[in-house]
Curated annotation (Swiss-Prot):
Keywords: Cell membrane, Membrane, Phosphate transport, Phosphoprotein, Symport, Transmembrane, Transmembrane helix, Transport, Ubl conjugation. Interacts with NLA. Mostly expressed in roots, in tissues connecting the lateral roots to the primary root. Also present in flowers, in senescing anther filaments and in the abscission zone at the base of siliques. Expressed in hydathodes and axillary buds, and in some senescing leaves. After Pi starvation, localized in all cells of undifferentiated root segments, including root tips and root hairs, and in the epidermis, cortex and stellar regions of mature root segments. Pfam families: Sugar_tr (PF00083). One of its GO terms (biological process) is phosphate ion transport. It is a multi-pass membrane protein. GO terms for molecular function: phosphate transmembrane transporter activity; symporter activity. This is Inorganic phosphate transporter 1-4.
Amino acid sequence: MAREQLQVLNALDVAKTQWYHFTAIIIAGMGFFTDAYDLFCISLVTKLLGRIYYHVEGAQKPGTLPPNVAAAVNGVAFCGTLAGQLFFGWLGDKLGRKKVYGMTLMVMVLCSIASGLSFGHEPKAVMATLCFFRFWLGFGIGGDYPLSATIMSEYANKKTRGAFVSAVFAMQGFGIMAGGIFAIIISSAFEAKFPSPAYADDALGSTIPQADLVWRIILMAGAIPAAMTYYSRSKMPETARYTALVAKDAKQAASDMSKVLQVEIEPEQQKLEEISKEKSKAFGLFSKEFMSRHGLHLLGTTSTWFLLDIAFYSQNLFQKDIFSAIGWIPPAQSMNAIQEVFKIARAQTLIALCSTVPGYWFTVAFIDVIGRFAIQMMGFFFMTVFMFALAIPYNHWTHKENRIGFVIMYSLTFFFANFGPNATTFVVPAEIFPARFRSTCHGISAASGKLGAMVGAFGFLYLAQNPDKDKTDAGYPPGIGVRNSLIVLGVVNFLGILFTFLVPESKGKSLEEMSGENEDNENSNNDSRTVPIV
């Protein structure tokens, strides 16, 4: 049986959309803007790093990062992100969302700058220091996932909560675009100031000494939006749900939200104390009671995020083939180092503009209309369909006259990842767990996703290699080929459909309804259905 809600929480649930909602979206969203910039800008400069630090005299093609170095440079931030999601998620429940929120930004600011200052006399030393700082950059980025999602969900009203939380996540799309646009500007400026011949004409002269500044400037620029947001985050009040339900301070919660909502709210400290005495609310994380109430939900959020990120991040494998096929990136030897940065940045920006960003904002528009479950199910379904449609007739798509069709199918997979599970896996864990575990459980779910990202980004990089050892990329062992890898990804997406049935629908419900925190007794089960009943 449900009890009467605390007035301060009810006021938040029924509040009309106000300016403070948009302020919270901007403050939290700028963190995700920075996260995406920092995580994805490395892909813009890895080719340049290969030219600068791994040039081979007399080689027909420009230098490239060795496979182990490329894996480390691209993947170390994911490792840091995973660790940060677990640590800051736990800390957000222990110390409060606000106290920890500023820490993540400071780590991101310092490590963005430090990444651009990576030093050493030998290429290995430069790459080692770059990897060190990018690990800790990822650590700060990881903290932003559970904290931003939790803060936004706890501030939002129940009618438009999904749109607000997914809008924060959608800022990633703008971060990816900003990285590409900034790289275009920087590379254009350096090309105009320091023109140089193509690699085929002058191998050594094609990489100017000033190119070493280009990648450093691009990496360090990530500190700017993070630094600009720090003051605003420090002025945000603690969320009422943490203050009331975890810190047990109804007076402070009412005072904070009275200022935010600009309404008079009664503290109700006595009612809160009565709620706190109930033994049913004393169960711990991973206790028998927790597992009976939320175990399947946690399995649902972790498994779907894990499976989604395997598919989502492995799609980057095919970008180089697609960009080359449609002429966005000419052969490396036909360009100088700075021109290559420009071409890669332009391609990434176009992909973000045409498929990534629209997908995010379709989710924002429809998540509170058709629900999280429907969007996630639809996204996984279409990702499965398009992956098999690419895989089964793969030889058909390799013919030059059919490559545009391949690009369209590929873009649609990206679109339905973002208008689908890439957004919903972020939203749902912030809505369905009790306040005292909310940040931790979101961190666990997100960390599971980053584990999937590592499998997708690196496992499939090896898996997709040609079975013929003479046709593999330099330094890689034979794999199962692109076609078979696409079939595996189709199966992964299909598993995502099945595990989605473990994830409850939270559209239109309060956080306390979803978590069972408004139930009167120990035997009351959370009645949120996994599959929505129409």
